[in-house]
């Protein structure tokens, strides 16, 4: 670990915190329909959209109607993406003449982008046409992020409102999230990325003649065959426009298979820093929005404090683990010097190094982004355990756009309930009595997540002809690959231990179901909880009310997240990355 590395980490989090308050205050104004500086331009566009779609903007929805609208919209857009993938060979903007996407892979991809997971069991350069990338996938990057923001705002309204049966209008919330929040930032961000070297074109792929042709010799049917490659195909495409929303919307699906380690997606250290900041910007801002809309700004900062504690613990552990030398490479100098990074540089880009790779891995899995600038499968066992653990916490450490906040607020309900039990009185949260139904919905939300991850992982491990053939490493690392895949899918993250071959019938179908359940089945109890809170009468604060604006609350919330979230998966982690670390220190490998 170096001073330079810690300085970059410090600059990153300082930039996020500086941007959180102005963006959070702005989003509160947007969703409370107060005046903003973009209104003269966007209000006419908004009204036109409502007129064209027959949306009655002033009519608010019960939580069941809000949920139904969200599900209908998601199902319709998922079907649209599936159809585009299947018939892309007949559509324009396909200069490489790529064929239609196979049915199971198209199903997996459509669910993936609808749920904000962006799991990619395919190589984009050789699978998706430009039209599919733009109309089928990039649009979902906006839609799925806007849905997440809308759901978070609905939950905040549930907390803030008293004796009301409605949570807002889904169509209005989603529209305003796109027009007022996502689009303006993405336009500016895409231009900045282009200035750094991110490409934006509709050209056919470029065939370049290499300076030194490469020869490969292999044995085929008992004969030695030598092939010489004198050209290289360089993929092109409209990358910058998709890269901006990929990061800002915590989507994560790469235009290229190498994702943000590809120089056309993330060419410079500055673009790398800006992409990381954009991942955390809206989730951090939403904690300020929470404080603004509930009338308790200090509560928003207390929630943000818990996120910061968990984030720092993760990035410090990952950075330390990756800066350590591999104990099996006895004959290699792995010490950091002026001319080499030292530590574990396998799977990392030299333009980023260990600090930025560890920071990016932590950020992308704290949020449900899933973009990568280094290969998580090549991390040291404990370094790779950090992104896995971040996902297993439910991705509430900043979390995905919107989804991270409502997931964190479910943990807040549980923490307040536990605090009430400790002092022997009915728990209260910002003027709401927390009763049996609220705790039941919160626990249902929290139980679905580990059941899906551990259930599917167990089936994959116990089926020699389904799950096991796809792992590239036997032993504990193979288990970690499977755990990571189902954690990433259920947590709507999308990153992977890429040594797992996920483009099989079993993984395309099972991971598709995991993504669907992890997104939509968990939303139902969350909205039910929000709807129930909105109907409650206001409970005046007394001396016995547990304060949710203090450092004590932040510590309690962090503790509940660790106990309820992390310890659930400790046995599985013990058989995966922890065991692999111990065996590595003992000189064992697989």
From Swiss-Prot:
Coiled-coil region list: none
Source superkingdom: Bacteria
The entry's keywords: Cell inner membrane, Cell membrane, Ion transport, Membrane, Potassium, Potassium transport, Transmembrane, Transmembrane helix, Transport
Main localization (coarse): membrane
Protein name: Potassium-transporting ATPase potassium-binding subunit
Quaternary structure (record): The system is composed of three essential subunits: KdpA, KdpB and KdpC.
Topology in the lipid bilayer: Multi-pass membrane protein
GO cellular component: plasma membrane
Subcellular location: Cell inner membrane
Annotated TM spans: 11-31, 64-84, 136-156, 178-198, 273-293, 301-321, 403-423, 442-462, 511-531, 552-572
Keyword Transport found: yes
UniProt-recorded Gene Ontology molecular function terms: P-type potassium transmembrane transporter activity; potassium ion binding
Family of this protein: Belongs to the KdpA family.
Keyword Nucleus: no
Lineage: Bacteria, Pseudomonadati, Acidobacteriota, Terriglobia, Terriglobales
Function: Part of the high-affinity ATP-driven potassium transport (or Kdp) system, which catalyzes the hydrolysis of ATP coupled with the electrogenic transport of potassium into the cytoplasm. This subunit binds the periplasmic potassium ions and delivers the ions to the membrane domain of KdpB through an intramembrane tunnel.
